[in-house]
């Protein structure tokens, strides 16, 4: 049998070529798996650091890594079940604060800012109570809209829903924190937000003044309230 014949040579060459391609493919798959594992580990470490901030701010406890079926829900950015003593409304309030603080879809960054703010508020008492008091002191009960009537633009006051009241209060506090930071790049946003929440809980600050100005404007234009059609 001639091993160096044309047919035998083609068979050996094709088998060696298949082995080469399969080995290269396995190397690529292994490299991709290692990269995904590294990215997953870094993401887990980042999430764990944020959870440490929040747990320290609210309870002073460190979270333990879940196993089994709960491991998939642990990586969810909106899961706050690891914090004891929070009801559904308080969890939704924290989520709303994170979502309104978010810019360009960078939720991890906004979550870090909020949790660092809680970390700074921890020495002053219950963080959730301070946040709720600040929102209660800032949220408006009415707003003013421009309505064109007989060729004239009127400012028509109207009562707003509770959900929008909370949204406006959080938005005003974040805007006030951003104003505090203007021209002072050495100060972080979480420091400014911490100062604004602390002042708002004491019925002071820029956001509280904005709420009072809006109420005065609505009081001055209450004679046009019957024009409200929405």
Swiss-Prot record:
Coiled-coil residue windows: none
Keyword RNA-binding among record annotations: yes
Keyword annotations: Mitochondrion, Ribonucleoprotein, Ribosomal protein, RNA-binding, rRNA-binding
Pfam families: Ribosomal_S7
One cellular component term from this protein's GO annotations in UniProt: mitochondrial small ribosomal subunit
Record-level GO BP terms: translation
Function: One of the primary rRNA binding proteins, it binds directly to 18S rRNA where it nucleates assembly of the head domain of the small subunit.
Family membership: Belongs to the universal ribosomal protein uS7 family.
Subunit relationships: Part of the small ribosomal subunit.
Protein name: Small ribosomal subunit protein uS7m
Protein's organism: Marchantia polymorpha
Gene behind the chain: RPS7
């Amino acid at each position: 049998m001639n091993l160096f014949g044309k047919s035998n040579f083609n068979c050996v060459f094709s088998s060696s070529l298949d082995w080469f391609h399969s080995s290269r493919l396995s190397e690529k798959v292994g490299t991709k798996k290692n990269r995904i594992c590294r990215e997953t580990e870094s993401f887990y470490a980042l999430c764990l650091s944020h959870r440490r901030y929040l747990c320290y701010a609210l309870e002073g406890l460190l979270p333990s890594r879940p196993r089994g079926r709960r491991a998939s829900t642990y990586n969810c950015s909106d899961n706050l079940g690891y914090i004891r003593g929070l009801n559904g409304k308080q969890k939704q309030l924290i989520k709303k604060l994170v979502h309104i603080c978010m810019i360009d879809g960078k939720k991890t960054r906004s979550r870090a800012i909020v949790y660092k703010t809680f970390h700074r508020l921890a020495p002053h008492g219950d963080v959730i109570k301070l946040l709720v008091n600040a929102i209660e002191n800032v949220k408006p009960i009415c707003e003013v809209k421009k309505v064109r009537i007989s060729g004239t633009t009127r400012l028509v006051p109207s009562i707003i829903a509770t959900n929008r009241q909370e949204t406006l209060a959080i938005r005003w506090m974040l805007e006030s924190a951003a104003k505090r930071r203007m021209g002072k790049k050495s100060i972080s946003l979480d420091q400014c937000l911490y100062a604004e929440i602390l002042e708002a809980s004491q019925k002071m600050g820029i956001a509280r003044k904005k709420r009072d100005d809006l109420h005065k404007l609505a009081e001055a234009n209450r004679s046009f309230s019957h024009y409200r059609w929405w």
